[in-house]
Every structure is written in structure tokens, then in C-alpha cells.
């Protein structure tokens, strides 16, 4: 595919501002994408600043390499942000990072390129992998999973209330021929959905669940949050933008847990006074959402929510 798919970075100014960038600071962009946040952050850094970008997507890596060639302060790594702890340790940066940004979910170029297989609106190969060279594709999962496994993925990760009906329809149809195209799967799911939601494609939730499963998105998020906390220096900022309730719930619980501290889980009269049990994060402000102006310019920002925390110890 030679087509260029435009990506509008969500909460661009808000996210960069939340990082409170210092000119000589060291920062991590865990989800480089097409580099919107990274470019804006580099504008805030001085000659001594450093920015390390992560992405699994080969197309994002191409964009990142071009940026690295332009700007020696930037380095791109083809890894999931779930593995940022390993990369940070290898570079001797653990506990020295001033800010970590995670902009979760799928980028517009991934959604809009039919060949990537993420979209039910544009027909393409049923793939859905962020890195097409790793793991099993959506087509392979649909071909080999049991009816119960398919239903669980739709229910748990897509929050689809008709998951069982959809899974049953998929298993019945695949006995005739395998699913290889997104439009084919979307059609079967749509027919199996008895109650369409106004303004929402009937296949939306099922496709979300399938994508999250194929890419282990929630597992990666949990690992990435833990790694980000260990990577940060005291006073460093963690900024996370999520796009659906499952992601946001994980981020919210993680930040709240570390803002309360382990002592909150111990009996009140227990004679223990140790820094080990003190809070590790401080929540900064309330969750932020896209402005009316941004919503008009980029409707995909409507579900975005940004949470910010600062490392205390």
C-alpha cells in the first residue's frame, strides 16, 4: 500500500503540557504512532534533552526512523511499551526518566488502511495485528477458537451483550468456508446482532474485542504501567490517554492504588511505619477530555480520556 493515511493526534497540547517538559529532560513516548506527540515534545526540549519512542507497528517505525535521522535527540525502538522496562534498563535509564506518555489504542492510519484488517467499514484481510510479523492474526483466531472462546473475547474485551449469538453464527458459517476478510466477518456479526445501537455499527464491539485479544492490549497495558512507574525519576510524570472503558479502568485503578499506598490495605492499628508502604504516585488534576473545538476537528477524540500522575518515590 502506497496510500498515505492522515492521523490527527488527540489531546496534543494537553498531553505535552501535562509532562511539564524540561529542556534537558529524558522522556519516553510509549506509543509513537505517526509521531505527533513526539514532535511536539521535541520542540520543548533543548539540545540536552532526550526522547525515546516505542512502537510495534512497522509503518510507525519507518516514520520514527525518519524523525531520528532529522533529530539526534530522538531514538525509535520497535518494541511494545510493555517492554519499556527492559529497554530502559539496557540504556541505564531506570529511575531517571522525567516523563512517560502512553496514547493507547489504534491510530487513524491503522484503522483507515484496509490492508491492516482493523476496520469493519473498509474490506481487507482479517489481520488486526499491530505488528503483522508477530502473533496470530484475527483470521487464525476465528478459524481455530472454540465458540466459547470467541464469545468470551467479544464479551470481556468488547463488552458485547450478544457475544454468544455472534460466536454461534461465526462457528456455523466457518464450517462452510473460513473467514479471510473483514467485511465477511462484519456481515455475519451484523446479522447476528438483534439490537443495533443508534449511531454505532453493529460490529463495533465485537471488532474491538477481537483486536484487543489479538494484540494482548490489556495485558500489555498492565505491564507497561508497572514498567513506566519504575522507569520514572522522583517528580517524573506519567500521562496516559485511553479510548475505551476497559483501558481507562486499568489506568484509573493503577494510579489510585499507587496514590493510596500499600498502607491503605493494612490494618489501621498495625505498628508499621515504613516508606515501603507510602504512596508512590500523586494524582494531578481531574481526567481531561477533548475540547469542543477538538471534537469538531477530530470526531475520533470523543472517547479519549487523559489521566496524569507524578512519582513521589
From Swiss-Prot:
Which residues of this UniProt protein bind S-adenosyl-L-methionine?
35-37, 55, 81, 103, 110
> GO biological process: what's one of them?
rRNA base methylation
The residue ranges crossing the membrane are none
Keyword match S-adenosyl-L-methionine? yes
For this protein, the record's InterPro entries field holds:
RsmH, SAM-dep_MeTrfase_MraW_recog, SAM-dependent_MTases_sf
Listed NCBIfam families: 16S rRNA (cytosine(1402)-N(4))-methyltransferase RsmH (TIGR00006)
- What is the protein name given in its UniProt record? Ribosomal RNA small subunit methyltransferase H
This chain is encoded by the gene named rsmH
Amino acid at each position: 500500500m502506497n496510500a498515505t493515511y492522515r492521523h490527527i493526534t488527540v489531546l496534543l497540547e494537553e498531553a505535552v503540557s501535562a509532562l511539564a517538559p524540561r529542556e534537558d529532560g529524558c522522556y519516553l513516548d510509549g506509543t509513537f504512532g505517526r509521531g505527533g506527540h513526539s514532535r511536539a515534545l521535541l520542540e520543548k526540549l533543548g539540545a540536552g534533552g532526550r526522547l525515546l519512542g516505542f512502537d510495534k507497528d512497522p509503518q510507525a517505525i519507518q516514520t520514527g526512523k525518519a524523525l531520528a535521522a532529522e533529530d539526534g535527540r530522538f531514538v525509535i525502538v520497535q518494541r511494545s511499551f510493555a517492554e519499556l522496562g527492559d529497554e530502559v534498563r539496557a540504556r541505564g535509564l531506570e529511575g531517571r526518566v522525567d516523563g512517560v506518555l502512553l496514547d493507547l489504542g489504534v491510530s487513524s492510519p491503522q484503522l483507515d488502511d484496509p490492508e491492516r484488517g482493523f476496520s469493519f467499514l473498509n474490506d481487507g484481510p482479517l489481520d488486526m495485528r499491530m505488528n503483522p510479523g508477530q502473533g496470530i492474526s484475527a483470521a487464525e483466531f476465528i478459524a481455530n477458537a472454540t465458540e466459547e472462546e470467541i464469545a468470551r473475547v467479544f464479551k470481556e474485551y468488547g463488552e458485547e451483550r450478544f457475544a454468544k449469538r455472534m460466536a454461534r453464527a461465526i462457528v456455523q458459517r466457518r464450517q462452510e468456508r473460513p473467514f479471510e476478510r473483514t467485511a465477511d466477518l462484519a456481515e455475519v456479526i451484523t446479522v447476528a446482532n438483534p439490537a443495533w445501537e443508534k449511531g454505532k455499527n453493529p460490529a463495533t464491539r465485537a471488532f474491538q474485542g477481537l483486536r484487543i485479544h489479538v494484540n494482548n492490549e490489556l495485558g500489555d497495558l498492565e505491564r507497561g504501567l508497572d514498567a513506566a512507574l519504575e522507569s520514572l525519576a522522583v517528580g517524573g510524570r506519567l500521562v496516559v490517554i485511553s479510548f475505551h472503558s476497559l483501558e481507562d479502568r486499568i489506568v484509573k485503578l493503577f494510579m489510585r492504588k499507587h496514590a493510596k499506598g500499600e498502607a491503605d490495605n493494612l490494618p489501621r492499628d498495625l505498628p508499621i511505619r515504613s516508606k515501603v508502604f507510602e504512596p508512590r504516585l500523586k494524582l494531578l488534576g481531574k481526567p481531561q477530555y477533548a475540547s469542543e473545538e477538538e471534537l469538531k476537528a477530530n470526531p475520533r477524540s470523543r472517547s479519549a480520556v487523559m489521566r496524569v500522575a507524578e512519582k513521589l518515590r
